[in-house]
Amino acid sequence: MRPPAFWFTQPARPSVAARLLAPLGRAYAAATARRLRAEGHRAGVPVICIGNLNAGGTGKTPTAIALLQRLSDRGVAAHVVSRGYGGRLEGPVQVDPRRHRAAEVGDEPLLLAAFGPAWVARDRAAGVRAAEAAGAQAILLDDGFQNPSVVKDLSVVVVDAAVGFGNGRCLPAGPLREPVAEGLGRADLLLSIGEAEAQRRFAADWPALPVPRLTGRLATLQMGMDWQEARVLAFAGIGRPEKFFASLRAEGAVLLRAEALDDHQPLGEALMRRLEIEAMALGAQLVTTEKDAVRLPPSFRQKVLTLPVRLELDDWTALDAAFDRLGLRRTG
């Protein structure tokens, strides 16, 4: 299900629908605030939360990959703990890409497990304990910002600069899980991801933020594939599939068809056969995202190309300083 357009109007000019739903949004915000009062588990190692205020995709997975790699470069064994959205296993269980499928552990943990130890746990505190017992020197808590079950030592809120915080209202009147002021009041850093023009608009729309802001962009990982003039049928089931389609066009690919699927939508045999037939009729190559690729049926894994992206931060200084304060530095 795609988010409604009225979620992303200017905050100063809310739509009629947003105004009508505002009481429900206030009730949602109040429920979140009550939930956040609960006591959390204090881990024995630093816990870094990568979260967002918006419902849906903002770039948390590329951020988690970047932080895993940065901590690894510092000699820190960081483990990811995720709820495993879309998977059926309750955990805690360490994700094994050779054994697990997305239907069991979720697509994001399965992708993240290629970059470092990843755990799935419905009970995040239990997942943190399991990771600690397995030797984690730091925990990356994936999408747990509104979950109070684990105490966070560093919270990084990620936002897509192209859409910002939408109309600034809470679900269902807008895209927010909690009000901007309250959410950023608990955060340590804000990371806005997007190209220069999107960053400029975000800064203009949200000029007075109570938290230091980092900026970055998603850059295509060069894998030797020449996308120039490549005829493709692209499909994506992520938070904002149009970002993926735009990245392909920026690489020079010719999108003969772009199919936006629901976020985390299962990629069953019937759907993939339909897309394959359409691609053959168009003389096009099937292309998807890394996150979607882990949900592909085995029979299609050699038939579909991916366009990997990685987060490039403009300046790591603030994050490196935060890691230093937490004692996350190479020793010996």
Swiss-Prot record:
It comes from Cereibacter sphaeroides (strain ATCC 17025 / ATH 2.4.3) (Rhodobacter sphaeroides). SUPFAM superfamilies: P-loop containing nucleoside triphosphate hydrolases. It comes from the Bacteria. NCBIfam families: lpxK. One of its GO terms (biological process) is lipopolysaccharide core region biosynthetic process. It catalyses: a lipid A disaccharide + ATP = a lipid IVA + ADP + H(+). It holds the Pfam family LpxK. GO terms for cellular component: plasma membrane. Belongs to the LpxK family. Pathway: Glycolipid biosynthesis; lipid IV(A) biosynthesis; lipid IV(A) from (3R)-3-hydroxytetradecanoyl-[acyl-carrier-protein] and UDP-N-acetyl-alpha-D-glucosamine: step 6/6. The keyword Transferase applies. Transfers the gamma-phosphate of ATP to the 4'-position of a tetraacyldisaccharide 1-phosphate intermediate (termed DS-1-P) to form tetraacyldisaccharide 1,4'-bis-phosphate (lipid IVA). It is an enzyme of class 2 (transferase). This is Tetraacyldisaccharide 4'-kinase. Its EC number is 2.7.1.130. PANTHER family: TETRAACYLDISACCHARIDE 4'-KINASE, TETRAACYLDISACCHARIDE 4'-KINASE, MITOCHONDRIAL-RELATED. GO terms for molecular function: ATP binding; tetraacyldisaccharide 4'-kinase activity. ATP binds at residues 54-61. Keywords: ATP-binding, Kinase, Lipid A biosynthesis, Lipid biosynthesis, Lipid metabolism, Nucleotide-binding, Transferase.
